[in-house]
Amino acid sequence: MPRANEIKKGMVLNYNGKLLLVKDIDIQSPTARGAATLYKMRFSDVRTGLKVEERFKGDDIVDTVTLTRRYVDFSYVDGNEYVFMDKEDYTPYTFTKDQIEEELLFMPEGGMPDMQVLTWDGQLLALELPQTVDLEIVETAPGIKGASASARNKPATLSTGLVIQVPEYLSPGEKIRIHIEERRYMGRAD
C-alpha cells in the first residue's frame, strides 16, 4: 500500500469505510526540526458527493482503490446532465453539472481530446481532463504596444468563463495554452 506522500490528484482512497476521490492536495512543510510534512487532502465522497478534508503525515500508509479508465468524447447536454460517449464501445456516461463543475471551466464547446472517465466496480466516479487545454481569450485589457514579456500580468476571461492571469502583451482573440491542474498560463497555442 502506498504512503500519503505518493498520493496524486485523481486517485481514490478507501478511508474509514468511504471511497474518497482526491480533488486537491496541499503540502505543508513545518519549519521545526523533526516535524513531519503534512498532506492536507480535499476529497469528494464517491457515494454521497460530499466534500471531505483529511490530513496525513507523509509516511502514513493509505489504502488506494484501482480504477478503470476509459477514453471518452463529449456527446451532448440534456438539461442539467452532460453525456460522454466511450470511444471503444460507445457506452454513454452521464454526469450532472454539479459533479463536473470544475472540469467545465476548462472544456471548450464540443469537448476536448484525451478525456477519461474513472469507474470502479461499474460505478461512475469522475471525469479526468488532460494536462493542458487551448482556449481563446474573450475579454482582457488591451495589449500595450511595446510591452515586454516581463512578469507583469493582467486578468483575462477565456471562452469557457474561466479567469486567469496572463502576460500584459496578450489581447482578446488570441488562443493560449492553460495548465489545467495549476490554472496557469503556459504560452500561446500553436
UniProtKB/Swiss-Prot annotation:
CDD domains (alphabetical): S1_EF-P_repeat_1 (cd04470), S1_EF-P_repeat_2 (cd05794)
GO molecular function terms listed in the Swiss-Prot or TrEMBL record: translation elongation factor activity
GO cellular component: cytoplasm; cytosol
Gene3D superfamilies registered for this protein in UniProt: 2.30.30.30, Nucleic acid-binding proteins (2.40.50.140)
InterPro entries on file: Elong-fact-P_C, NA-bd_OB-fold, Rib_uL2_dom2, Transl_elong_fac_P/YeiP, Transl_elong_KOW-like, Transl_elong_p-like_YeiP, Transl_elong_P/YeiP_cen, Transl_elong_P/YeiP_CS
GO BP terms in the entry: peptide biosynthetic process
PANTHER family in alphabetical order: ELONGATION FACTOR P (PTHR30053), TRANSLATION ELONGATION FACTOR KOW-LIKE DOMAIN-CONTAINING PROTEIN (PTHR30053:SF14)
Family annotation (NCBIfam families): PRK00529.1, PRK04542.1, yeiP
UniProt similarity note: Belongs to the elongation factor P family.
Protein's recorded name: Elongation factor P-like protein
Native species: Escherichia coli (strain K12)
Gene: yeiP
